[in-house]
Amino acid sequence: MGLQCGIVGLPNVGKSTLFNCLSNAKAQAANFPFCTIEPNVGVITVPDERLTKLTEIVQPKAVVPNVIEIVDIAGLVKGASKGEGLGNQFLANIRATNAIIHVLRCFDNDNVIHVDGSVDPIRDKEIIDTELQLKDLDSIEKKIQKVEKMAKTGGDKEAKKTFDVLTVYKNHLLSGKSARTAPVAEEDKEYIADIWLLTAKPVMYVCNVDEGSVSTGNAYVERVKAAVKEENAEVLIISAQIEAEIAELESYEERQMFLNDLGLTESGVNKLIKAAYRLLNLATYFTAGVQEVRAWTITQGFTAPQAAGVIHTDFEKGFIRAEVIKYEDFVKFNGSEAIIKENGKLGVEGKTYIVQDGDIMHFRFNV
């Protein structure tokens, strides 16, 4: 679906180390290739144990996993909103993404200098927040100038509503808060859709900790959790140092042994990719046949015809019905369609069916 998460963070917080770990195919549980579109963009396999299980049952000729694009966004300094440093490029890159992964330094290490001289993840967060908020204020001011006259003098109800919504966002941003927490009804957000507010994008915070804090967190992490409570954002604890060590290991077995020794069940990279998928409000359905078992990415809430359209637009246009098997039932009956039917577990769904995460689907269509 071409959806992107952008990784942001100040210099020396571990952002590039994490991106490099993500961009290393060896660091992923399944050996699907990582490819680079350009130096700072990676297409990364989404780990999914269900796909592995379906592959074991069906034994297909080909397996196609879900992927997600991760963008390493460089160039943030104080003043980026005014174009300082690589500010203009930074802001253009972040505007193109669908969600933000914000990496914060939550470890002490005298050998790794901090751009501001001391470790303070809340200050670091606020530096980036402020630059994005300033850029959003600039975008809002420009739009207000366009609609203000019509809103105040004419009888243009649309302009009046747009002006009112923009004013709510403006006051919220002026109070030092991000657009995503503004008290605006979901249906009113369409009034700002054309100005692509940076701080309206969903965000996740990654606390980069030392090796000893990866299981439990530390005082820095607790401060971050308290600071982002209002945003209802996910906070992940990852050690970029550990992830870099994992990336050096050759085999999946070696990586699992290494994680077990640390008391971890999966790598931080895997956790991060899965969390990014959730952040983008995505879901997965599967098609399963001897030629191919494949994971398909959809937005949560897609109807059956919309989901069919992800495979090919003809599937959506000529949609007749969808045959649906729940993942749990497919596994329980070892993929036998005959037994699944006998047990009444093969659903036949029409155009209004909302596809559920994990559904195994077969579409009937006529073009």
Predicted feature locations:
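C-terminal-of-GTPase-core extension/linker across diverse P-loop GTPases
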Residues: 2-8, 13, 19, 146-354, ...
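Amphipathic, soluble alpha-helical interaction motifs
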Residues: 57, 100-103, 131, 143, ...
